[in-house]
Amino acid sequence: MDDTEGNSSMDSIRNGQSSPLPQVTPRLPQIPMMMRETPLSTKRERQAITPRFRRPAPKMIKTMPPTRSIWSVRKESVPLLVTPQGPKPLESPKYDHTNAQSFFEQVFQIDEIIGRGSFGEVFAARCREDSQLYAVKVSLAPIRQHSISKYREAESHMIIPPHKNLVKFYRAWEETGRLYIQTELCDQSLLKYCTEKHALPEDEIWNIFVDLLQAVHHLHSNDMIHDDIKPENIFLTKDMICKLGDFGLVINLKNPNDVKSAEEGDSKYLAPEVLNGRPTKSSDIFSLGMTILEATTDLDVPSNGDSWHQIRNGQIPDRFFAGISTDLRSLIALMLDSDPRIRPTSRDLLDHPVIKKKLMKRGTYVKCISILNGFFYAFSAVLVWVMAFFSVLFHPIVRFHAAIKDRQSEICAQFVNNQQHTPIQTPETSKVYLESLTGVAVRQASQIVSPFDFSDDENPPNAQRRLFTGAVPCRLNFDNDQDDDEEQATCSSSNSSAIEPQLDEPESPPRMNDVIDKLGKRGTPRSARRNLTFNRHRQVAASVAPKSSLNHYNHHTGSGDGFSNNSLIPISDQERTEKYLRMRLTEQQLDWADQNNVIDEAPPPMSCPPRIRRSIRDLPRMPVLNFNVLDEPSNKPTVDHHTILEQSESPRRRLNRGAKPVPRNRMMSFGSSGDEV
């Protein structure tokens, strides 16, 4: 291979290829010159150079999977409260021993999972006892009954005195072989906060440094070692107050068992002397320095390798400290010293002049926040108490007022029910309609009716108007009391009626015998007989009067309630039945004729089209009103509107009008009205 080929291959390795070959691991893009000096990099730079591919999934191994959720295994046990004196039965007004659910499920309302690790899961849950949000940590692995560190974390929380920069502990209990720890709920972790912002302002770094230093000093003053200080175990409240939590690896120097069973924390923040020995207070200072270094420089802290030793040897490039003050950089260098004897203690750091100044400023801020929070909580408690007091005070008055309103509604309903009047456009599903005479007659009489109504009413698009039989047959007599012009009263769900002409005889109209046979099996509707025999006391007086006077009375008197004028004449049951049958037959013939003239298009909304009215109904057009005629002289020749209407009629209408006119009765019933022509 010649030199040109060798140089091209070396350049491709140094600069990287723009498009990697298939089936080949993609190479990293070109690394900046500042990063060639050291393998250390920031988190943002690491995200930019990380290859965007995933390794293949490992092969499936048919073994028993580990328990990864608290819901997978459940044992029947009684919840035990963990106390310094030993476990005790746990009681709560929200807990029912007979319920199959656990104490955690009954007393808490689980909102979400906010953390998950090798030890367990952390839930954000609202307690039903006080309606406050808490963080509940649940162990995944069942607790070993004879283990020395069975309640180690819970006991550490109870031994350590409360501090403003430590996560507040409430209680811990054991149930179904698992440990539950209830603590206060913070807004977010420091790891999440730094990952979102990458580079934090120096003022925020000083505040975090001062808060954590006070928490570590509080632990060291009580002979406790945290042994797991890292951004993941540091939490921020909504007021940006930093708190140290997760006491799972806390070592009590007063307890020999804790010293013997001490475990190593996260290797990223581990002091070098812990690899060959045990954790000490100086190792906590080193972990605190690594946490402040990561928050200040956004450094991607390595967990092993040469970079891990490079940081512990103090070989950190200056480019990571760009824009950082000398005081903060010198303090970080002191805490990261490889010799634990040279590292300052928490007391030495608090006595530093710069930290003293920052501590005084931070203390003022924390006191103001605590005062405001206390005032807010007190005001909330008073407000809740006042609301509860007024609720109890005015509750009887509100109930009394509601009872009065209900009684008023009942009285109004009784007054309306006493009125024997069915309103216009009453739906058939109405209780008032079903109990009325019309509703009873409609349910009892199964008469074939026309499915269409071509009245000038508001109709929904593509909807059919259903007609139903009226309760009482009525008629308008225009001759010498003949029965040929009798017609059964029908009504529709509209507020207008129309006089329809009787069309020619249909091709196959219903026969009288069929109607008689149909009615003979069922009989005359009881409501019709009751309506036709209305006002018996007046019928007795009418039977004595001469027939001519009755006819005269019928011709010139009309009742607006839908009753027949001739109903006052006493007739026998047989005559009444025959008249009723003739009326039904006449209406069926008319409906049959209407069905033969159905037009296959639905009337538009709001009104019936004029062309449908002109082609179906034999009604004269509405004349155009000209009000100027009233102002003109009266000697003008009068216009015969009937002649104009006859001339403008279509040939089909003239043909229909040439037939023998058959008088039609009005279509009327209770609650409806018609326009006379």
UniProtKB/Swiss-Prot annotation:
One of its GO terms (cellular component) is plasma membrane. Residues 1-30, 478-526, 632-677 are annotated as: Disordered. Keywords: ATP-binding, Cell cycle, Cytoplasm, Developmental protein, Differentiation, Golgi apparatus, Kinase, Magnesium, Membrane, Metal-binding, Nucleotide-binding, Oogenesis, Serine/threonine-protein kinase, Spermatogenesis, Transferase. Changing residue 561 to N: In hc145; induces defects in spermatogenesis. Residues 638-652 have a biased composition (Basic and acidic residues). It is an enzyme of class 2 (transferase). Residues 108-355 form the Protein kinase domain. It is found in: Golgi apparatus membrane; Cytoplasm. GO terms for biological process: embryo development ending in birth or egg hatching; meiotic cell cycle; meiotic nuclear membrane disassembly; negative regulation of G2/M transition of mitotic cell cycle; negative regulation of G2/MI transition of meiotic cell cycle; negative regulation of meiotic cell cycle process involved in oocyte maturation; negative regulation of ovulation; nematode larval development. Mg(2+) binds at residues 233, 246. Its EC number is 2.7.11.1. InterPro entries: CC_SR_Kinase (IPR050339), Kinase-like_dom_sf (IPR011009), Prot_kinase_dom (IPR000719), Protein_kinase_ATP_BS (IPR017441), Ser/Thr_kinase_AS (IPR008271). Residues 1-22, 489-499 have a biased composition (Polar residues). Disruption phenotype: Worms exhibit oocytes that mature prematurely (also known as the Emo phenotype) and chromosomes that appear condensed. Subcellular defects include irregular perinuclear foci in oocytes. RNAi-mediated knockdown results in an accumulation of damaged, compressed, polyploid oocytes in the uterus. RNAi-mediated knockdown in a double oma-1 and oma-2 knockout background allows for the progression of meiosis beyond the prophase stage and oocyte maturation, but these oocytes cannot be fertilized. One of its GO terms (molecular function) is ATP binding. It catalyses: L-seryl-[protein] + ATP = O-phospho-L-seryl-[protein] + ADP + H(+); L-threonyl-[protein] + ATP = O-phospho-L-threonyl-[protein] + ADP + H(+). It is a peripheral membrane protein. Pfam families: Pkinase. Acts as a negative regulator of entry into mitosis (G2 to M transition) by phosphorylation of the CDK1 kinase during oocyte maturation. Required for oocyte maturation, embryonic development, germline proliferation and initiation of meiosis during spermatogenesis. Required for chromosome structure during mitosis and negative regulation of nuclear envelope breakdown. Belongs to the protein kinase superfamily. Ser/Thr protein kinase family. WEE1 subfamily. This is Membrane-associated tyrosine- and threonine-specific cdc2-inhibitory kinase wee-1.3. The lineage of its organism: Eukaryota, Metazoa, Ecdysozoa, Nematoda, Chromadorea.
